[in-house]
C-alpha cells in the first residue's frame, strides 16, 4: 500500500483525526504526517457536518460505494470485504440521557492497514473507553487492535444494558409474587427493548464471528482469537435476551390472571352485597308504595320496629351466606 499524506485526510470539522503512534497512544494528525501501516490514522467524522460530508463525497481514498455507505441511513450490522479494505456497520447502546438506550446508535467503519474512517450522527458512548485508553497510552497499537478494542467496548455496554433489563425482570417477578401489578405499558416497553436488542445484536454477533474467521491482513491471530471471544460473549448475552423475552411472556400471562382474579373478586363482593340488601330493599320499596296507607304509620314505635326488623333481616341473610360458605 502507498503512504497517505496527512493533508489528504485532515478534515476541518472532524470529531477527531489522530495517528496511532504504535505504542498505545495517539497524536493529532498534521498535514505533513505520512500515514502508513506502521502509523495508521483514525479519522472520526459526524457525517452531517458540512466539511465531513464533502470530504466523504469527494475523497479518492474511499471506493464509491463506501462513500454512500459511510454517510447513508442506519442499517443492520454487517461486514463487507471491498478489495484491500473492509466496510463494517455496528450498533451500540445510546448513551444520551434524553433518549431510550434501546434506540441504538449506528457506527460505520471503513478500514485497511493504513486508514480507519469511522462515521456517526449521534455520539457513540462506547468510543469514550477506547479514546481514554489511547490518551493514557494504553490503547491499541494498530488497526486490528483498534477494531478489537472498539468491538469489546461495544459488547461491554450491550452486556451492561442487558443486565439492567434482567434486573428489572427479577424485580417485576418479585412484585408479581406479592400481587403488585406494574404500571400500564411498563412490561410492553421492557419487552420491546429486549426485542430491539435481539434484532440488532444477533447480526452483530455474526459480524464479530466473521471478523474472527476471515484472514484480514491487518489482524493477527491473537486479535482474531480475541474477536472470537467477544462474539462468544455477545452470544451469551443473546441467550440471556431470549430467556428474558420468554419470561416476559410468562409474566404477561400472570398479570392477566391476577387482574382477572381481582375483577372476579370485586364482582363477587358486589353480588354478595346485593344479596344482603335485596330483601330490605324489597320491603322498603313495598312500604313506600303507600297505596292504602303505611302499616303501623299511626303507631309511635312503628318506624323503630321496622328498622329493627330490617337489621334482623340483613343479619339473617348475612348469617345464611356465612353458613353456606359464600361469605
Curated annotation (Swiss-Prot):
Q: Does the keyword Nucleus apply?
A: no
| CDD domains named among the record's database cross-references | ZntB-like_1
InterPro entries tied to this protein: CorA_cytoplasmic_dom, CorA_TM1_TM2, MgTranspt_CorA/ZnTranspt_ZntB, Zn_transp_ZntB
Q: Which reaction does it catalyse?
A: Zn(2+)(out) + H(+)(out) = Zn(2+)(in) + H(+)(in)
Q: Which domain of life is it from?
A: Bacteria
Gene Ontology cellular-component terms listed: plasma membrane
Q: How is this protein situated with respect to the membrane?
A: Multi-pass membrane protein
Q: Where in the cell is it found?
A: Cell inner membrane
Q: Which Pfam families match?
A: CorA
Q: Which UniProt keywords apply?
A: Cell inner membrane, Cell membrane, Ion transport, Membrane, Transmembrane, Transmembrane helix, Transport, Zinc
Transmembrane stretches, start-end: 274-294, 301-321
Which intervals lie on the Cytoplasmic side per UniProt?
1-273, 322-327
Any coiled-coil regions, as ranges: none
- Residues in compartment: Periplasmic: 295-300
Give one GO molecular function term. cobalt ion binding
What family does the Swiss-Prot or TrEMBL record give for this protein?
Answer: Belongs to the CorA metal ion transporter (MIT) (TC 1.A.35) family.
Q: What does this protein do?
A: Zinc transporter. Acts as a Zn(2+):proton symporter, which likely mediates zinc ion uptake.
Which PANTHER family does this UniProt record tie to the protein?
Answer: CORA FAMILY METAL ION TRANSPORTER (EUROFUNG) (PTHR46494), ZINC TRANSPORT PROTEIN ZNTB (PTHR46494:SF3)
State the name under which the record lists this protein: Zinc transport protein ZntB
Taxonomic classification, please?
Bacteria, Pseudomonadati, Pseudomonadota, Gammaproteobacteria, Enterobacterales
The protein's gene is named: zntB
Amino acid at each position: 500500500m502507498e503512504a497517505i499524506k496527512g493533508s489528504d485526510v485532515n478534515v476541518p470539522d472532524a470529531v477527531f483525526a489522530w495517528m496511532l503512534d504504535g505504542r498505545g497512544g495517539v497524536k493529532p494528525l498534521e498535514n505533513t504526517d505520512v500515514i502508513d501501516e506502521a502509523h495508521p490514522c483514525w479519522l472520526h467524522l459526524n457525517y452531517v457536518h458540512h466539511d465531513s460530508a464533502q470530504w466523504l463525497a469527494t475523497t479518492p481514498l474511499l471506493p464509491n460505494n463506501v462513500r454512500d455507505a459511510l454517510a447513508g441511513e442506519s442499517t443492520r450490522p454487517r461486514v463487507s470485504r471491498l478489495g484491500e479494505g473492509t466496510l463494517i456497520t455496528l450498533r451500540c447502546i445510546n448513551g444520551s440521557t434524553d433518549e431510550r438506550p434501546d434506540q441504538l446508535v449506528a457506527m460505520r467503519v471503513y478500514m485497511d492497514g493504513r486508514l480507519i474512517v469511522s462515521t456517526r450522527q449521534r455520539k457513540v458512548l462506547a468510543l469514550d473507553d477506547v479514546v481514554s485508553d489511547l490518551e493514557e497510552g494504553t490503547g491499541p497499537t494498530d488497526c486490528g487492535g483498534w477494531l478489537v478494542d472498539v468491538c469489546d467496548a461495544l459488547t461491554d455496554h450491550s452486556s451492561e444494558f442487558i443486565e439492567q433489563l434482567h434486573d428489572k425482570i427479577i424485580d417485576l417477578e418479585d412484585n408479581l409474587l406479592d400481587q403488585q401489578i406494574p404500571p400500564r405499558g411498563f412490561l410492553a416497553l421492557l419487552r420491546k427493548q429486549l426485542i430491539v436488542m435481539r434484532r440488532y445484536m444477533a447480526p452483530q454477533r455474526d459480524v464479530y464471528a466473521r471478523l474472527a474467521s476471515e484472514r484480514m491482513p491487518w489482524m493477527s491471530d491473537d486479535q482474531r482469537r480475541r474477536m472470537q471471544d467477544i462474539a462468544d460473549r455477545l452470544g451469551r448475552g443473546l441467550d440471556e435476551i431470549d430467556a428474558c423475552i420468554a419470561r416476559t411472556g410468562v409474566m404477561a400471562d400472570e398479570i392477566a390472571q391476577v387482574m382477572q382474579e381481582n375483577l372476579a373478586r370485586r364482582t363477587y363482593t358486589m353480588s354478595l352485597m346485593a344479596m344482603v340488601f335485596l330483601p330490605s330493599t324489597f320491603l322498603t320499596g313495598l312500604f313506600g308504595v303507600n297505596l292504602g296507607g303505611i302499616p303501623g304509620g299511626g303507631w309511635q314505635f312503628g318506624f323503630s320496629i321496622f328498622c329493627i326488623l330490617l337489621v334482623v333481616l340483613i343479619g339473617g341473610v348475612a348469617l345464611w351466606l356465612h353458613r353456606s360458605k359464600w361469605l
